[in-house]
Amino acid sequence: MMGKSGSQQLLMDEKIYVAVGSDLGNKSTLVWAIQNTGGKEFCIVHVHQPLYRKEKEKTQKILDKYLQKCRQMQVCAEMIHIKMESVEKGIIQLISERNVKKLVMGAASDTRYSMRMADLLSTKAIYIRQEAPATCCIWFTCKGYLVYKRESIMGNTSLEYASTSSGQDSVRSRGSVIPSRQFTISRGNGNVYQLAVFEAEKSKKEASLEAFKHQEVVKEKNEAIKRGKEWESAYLEELKQRKETEMELKKVREKLEKMRYISENRITESYMLVQKLQDKYNLATKVLRKAKEERDLLIKGRDIAIIEVEELRKEVSRSDEHREAPQYFICPISLEVMKDPQLAADGFTYEAEAISTWLQGGHETSPMTNTKLHHTKLVPNLALRSAIQEWLHASSSFRK
């Protein structure tokens, strides 16, 4: 069996494994390991369930801070990630696969630490103490203090006594107390007494462990009942808020429906008003276009009358000697000198009585061109009438 000083020197040469969680709650565990184990190389172990991308990035940032702390304390460190549902089983698997000789982990969360704390409180730590290979030395710390140390057994027939924070001794293999029948004790009668004390201590710790497990089960049961009541209360509150929200939503929908109905009525009224205005506009446009056409005809008739008057004046001056009526004074229908000349739509001037008789007889065409008249309105040819009257007056004077 290797001496105690030789065993300690061998442990110092091994890499120190430090188990940490997904937050900075195990920072004190890492600091204690660097300051008290004497190791120069450290391996930070993190066991986790399969993570989503955002959770993985967040966890990686926290683990990087652990590595940064190692660099600040001038020690070499690496990181190991283990994907497993059970944290404690993941650590046991790591110890077995890598033949880990030294491990530092938390005995409980820092918030549960007290000066009276003399044993492990974490179910994970208790499980690892019982199930870890006997060749691994494990320190259990809490808030920067050593709570329990499980010494390693370097051979199949050798025993190491692990000193706890309370000063008690125990012999352990794979985390559980080694049965006395597996070893031959050759230290005299005193060893028999020590074995009896050890067996009693074993029974005491097993009873304490069972009591602790029972307390944990009761605690988890009470917490589950409490969470169930909280969830039920939250569900009822959410149901109440949902009903209130549905009522508010119903009121808003009714209000919106009413506003939509009013808006549709206003739109219909506006559309009808626009249609009326459009009809009035179309009628006004039609009347204006017709008035413009009539104005153009009047202007055309006026221009023609002016030309005819000028020609008549010339004709009168030429025919003063003969005293015969000019052709323009003669009605194309009655072939007599016109007394009341009227300008028709075809641009010709007729005796009022003759053209009226023509139109009243159902004719819609021009007596001169035989084309359809645009309208049947007659316009007095005042200029021609004035010229005829002058001619008649002049003829009367000439006869006298």
UniProtKB/Swiss-Prot annotation:
Class of enzymatic activity (EC top level): transferase
Pathway noted in the entry: Protein modification; protein ubiquitination
Record-listed E.C. numbers: 2.3.2.27
InterPro entries to which the protein is assigned, alphabetical: U-box_ubiquitin_ligases, Ubox_domain, Znf_RING/FYVE/PHD
One Pfam family per UniProt: U-box
Top-level taxon of origin: Eukaryota
Swiss-Prot/TrEMBL catalytic activity: S-ubiquitinyl-[E2 ubiquitin-conjugating enzyme]-L-cysteine + [acceptor protein]-L-lysine = [E2 ubiquitin-conjugating enzyme]-L-cysteine + N(6)-ubiquitinyl-[acceptor protein]-L-lysine
Summary of the function given for this chain in its UniProt record: Functions as an E3 ubiquitin ligase.
Protein name: U-box domain-containing protein 37
Organism for this UniProt entry: Arabidopsis thaliana (Mouse-ear cress)
UniProt lineage: Eukaryota, Viridiplantae, Streptophyta, Embryophyta, Tracheophyta
